[in-house]
Amino acid sequence: MEVYAATGMPALEIIGLPDASVKESRDRVSAAIVNSGFTMPISRLTVNLAPADQRKEGPAFDLPIAISILMASGQLEGMDLTQTLMLGELSLDGSLHPVRGALPMVISASEQGIVDIILPEGNAEEVACIQGLRVYPASSLRQVVNHLKGREPIPVQQQRQYSDVVSAVKCAVDMAQVQGQVGARRALEVAASGGHNLLMVGTPGSGKTMLARCLPGILPPLTFSESLETTRIHSIAGRLAPGTGLMAERPFCAPHHSASVASMIGGGSNAKPGEVSLAHNGVLFLDELPEFSRNTLEALRQPLEDGVVSVTRIHNQAQYQSSFMMVASMNPCPCGFYGSKTKKCRCSAKDIRRYLDRISGPLLDRIDIQVEVDAVPVKEISEGGAAESSAEVGARVRKVRELQQARYAQDGIHCNAQLDAGLSKKYCPMTPEATALLHMAVERMGMSMRAYGRVVKVARTIADMDGADIIGTTHVAEAIQYRELDGKYWKG
């Protein structure tokens, strides 16, 4: 950032491809300087934001612009701030407000060797776990100036350990609340253990949504590196409340079925991240899957396969990570009661086929586990014993995930769902009987090669849950079972 003070009519001009919010900082900065007890220079000021060909967005430039003007006018002298990062939005009275994107800016500065960080108090907790920094949380422009002059130094933000953040995570919906549903609970545990995509098909009120909302409680907490990735995306999107620290619980995003392609994938004038990126390292829950538009569903295919999504706009292009578990639920027909034992379906065969055909074959191929969720009889609810809690199930899931992380430590992946074809051959050995069973199922069920690969990965997860190094027939049989809805609803 550069400031040039020239003779002429008093004015403040900001150049360097600023957006509207940066241009508006002229009035905010001028008022903040005066109302903080300083003097706005009576000269023509030009603020240059380099590089000139990169668009500058957001009000985070307010504080550094104000400090630069005070230095250019001689009200701040004798200090070198080239190794200090400043950011923050100024109000008209000079107070500082938090800004979105603080975490990625601080991480980028740290990677360039910058240690001293001055930012709004509302952003301090967001960066408290980043080691090796001196973070000074400020409440106003006046406080920043007094700190720089050495009159009233701002206390350095106390650094936090990420383990303290993890210990504060609490389960929102406990699996102990789910009565019955033995098969669905098992499928949920398998999906969580391997990071697999899951589709639940069942009548209204059968418990599909509650099962999905139990998933974050049985998934292991985010690792520190995963937390940085996920929190960075949420910070860019402005989804972090002021005073919020790093995220430890895996995100659970549940967009409405009216969501557009832009809101799902990302977009807008500033190329903001969409739901697939906000769900990075977590869960993207699509309730009433066939109700989403065809374009929106088809747009999911690329991030599901690659784990990244590119958002291109006129002035900038951004690439966001989007490695998530997709969990979807749907009714078996438009009225919801096809195959129900208690209510009669009112839909014609044509209506049911049209409804199911809203989900394309390529998208179905990318869903590893398909399970039917039937309504639980009232007698089973009233007489059933206590179900396992999320803590009990989560302990088993964490054990399996730790096994996978150790196995893939040199391969750059974390769980079985991320295996590619080459790694599958390396890490998924099968007994001859299991191989024969799988080949027979592929021929009879008409599986694509993608579906075949996903059955192998699910079988690897089931074997891990059993503590087996080699995949056996029971593991393959259960994995094949999770593809049977293909034949019942889509290929029948």
For each predicted feature, which ranges?
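Peripheral, non-AAA+ core regions of ATP-driven protein-machinery
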Residues: 1-199, 203-209, 312, 451-452, ...
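Basic, amphipathic alpha-helical bundle interface domains used for macromolecular binding and assembly
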Residues: 15-26, 41, 48-58, 270-271, ...
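Short loop/turn elements that form and flank the Walker-type P-loop nucleotide-binding site
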Residues: 40-43, 80-81, 111-113, 131, ...
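Catalytic P-loop NTPase motifs of RecA-like helicase/translocase cores
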Residues: 93, 286-293, 336
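P-loop NTPase nucleotide-binding/switch module
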Residues: 152-190, 194, 221-276
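Walker A/P-loop
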Residues: 200-241, 306
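Walker B catalytic acidic pair
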Residues: 281, 287-288, 299
